[in-house]
Regions:
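Internal gly/pro-rich beta-alpha loop/helix module
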Residues: 92-94, 99-190
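Short gly/ser/thr-rich secondary-structure transition/capping motifs
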Residues: 75-83, 109, 134-137, 199-204, ...
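Short, conserved catalytic or adaptor-binding loops enriched in Gly and charged residues
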Residues: 68-73, 145-146, 166-169, 258-259
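Nucleotide and nucleotide-moiety/phosphate-recognizing core
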Residues: 9-99, 107-129, 254, 294
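Generic hydrophobic alpha-helical membrane-segment signal
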Residues: 85, 89-91, 118, 142, ...
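Small-residue (G/A/S/T)-rich helix-start motifs and N-terminal tracts that mark the onset
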Residues: 1-54, 61, 151, 162-303
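Short N-terminal micro-motifs specific to bacterial/archaeal maturation
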Residues: 58, 106, 143, 222-225
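A short, aliphatic-rich alpha-helical micro-motif
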Residues: 89-93, 146, 273-275, 299
Length: 303
């Protein structure tokens, strides 16, 4: 918790160096404990942190209780969230969301929903601690309400839910701090994030003498009437990803994609489907008789 608080303090000072009035919303668990540590460190630096609590410090337990007690021991004060409305306070120039962490599985309570709405309504940047409050860390779904952060500092590792569903809009700029946990700790990730640094190691420069026939052949099946754009976009994506040859098996009454992208070949009747290195079934396929027939035909021939 001390490491998390120190990481947050350093991160906030780096990204908002001119900020002075910090409103730190703390919850009932360890996420709130991180907020109390942050408040203590910020006070030591001469800043003016205002701690706004969803639960009274005396009702906390474990590490969160110790962090709250240490904040109070240095002269820090705690304002309850329900007393915030109508209070005459200096406006914050930075808001820290330390309400809820990774344990959110059920819709937020009404009091917590109101606090989230308050955070979202403040005219100041929001730093989320570990992940935005209200986000399911596994599914990425907002559990009734969700803090929309300007930036999120995640700890140990990035949570899968931050990159999916509502999490994409909630996290803002996403960064993470390992807090000293090294790969040798044996933590096994549940998913892998594909970003440019990772992908560039998979896409090697080709020799000038390279031949398209040696770089993979893709057969795309879809492009039903009215949905030709889906298979066209999929075909263009295959080309940009490096596929050497791409054929489109689309509805016979659809205009040929080669009118838009000459590199995309058609798939006339009698084409050897074993030609393809990989077969993609679905972009704009539809559920009519033609689409179902194509689905069954190609699925039965998949390896």
């Amino acid at each position: 918790m001390e490491r998390a608080g120190a990481a947050l303090c350093s991160y906030a000072r780096h990204h908002w160096p001119q900020s002075h009035h910090w409103w730190i919303f703390v919850g009932p668990g360890n996420n709130g404990g991180d907020g109390y540590v942050l408040a203590r460190l910020a006070r030591r630096l001469g800043l003016e942190p205002l701690v706004i609590a969803a639960r009274a410090p005396g009702l906390l337990r474990g590490d969160a209780r110790r962090a709250a007690d240490e904040w109070l021991a240095v002269g820090g004060e705690v304002m309850m969230a329900d007393a915030l409305e109508g209070a005459s306070l200096p406006s914050p120039d930075l808001v820290i969301d330390a309400l809820l962490g990774t344990g959110v599985q059920l819709p937020l309570s009404l009091p917590m929903t109101k606090i989230v709405a308050t955070i979202n309504g403040l005219n100041a940047p929001v730093l989320a601690v570990d992940l935005p409050s209200g986000l399911n860390a596994d599914t990425g779904r907002a559990m009734g309400a969700l803090v929309h952060a300007t930036r999120t500092l995640s700890f140990i590792g990035i949570k899968q839910g931050m990159l999916t569903a509502d999490g994409v809009d909630g996290v803002g700029q996403l960064d993470w701090d390992p807090l000293g946990v090294v790969p040798e700790a044996g933590l096994v990730p549940a998913a892998e994030r594909l970003d440019y640094p990772r992908l560039k190691n998979l896409l090697f420069p080709r020799p000038r003498s390279a031949h398209k026939g040696k770089h993979g052949k893709v057969l795309l099946v879809g492009g039903n009437l009215g949905m030709q754009g889906a298979i066209l976009l999929a075909g263009q994506a295959c080309l940009r990803a490096g596929a050497g040859l791409v054929r489109l098996c689309q509805h016979p009454d659809s205009p040929p994609a080669s009118l838009v992208q000459p590199e995309l070949m058609g798939c006339p009747a009698g084409t050897d489907e074993g030609w393809a290195t990989v077969r993609v079934l679905g972009p704009g396929l539809g559920q009519d008789e033609w689409g179902r027939a194509q689905f069954e035909h190609h699925l039965s021939r998949s390896e």
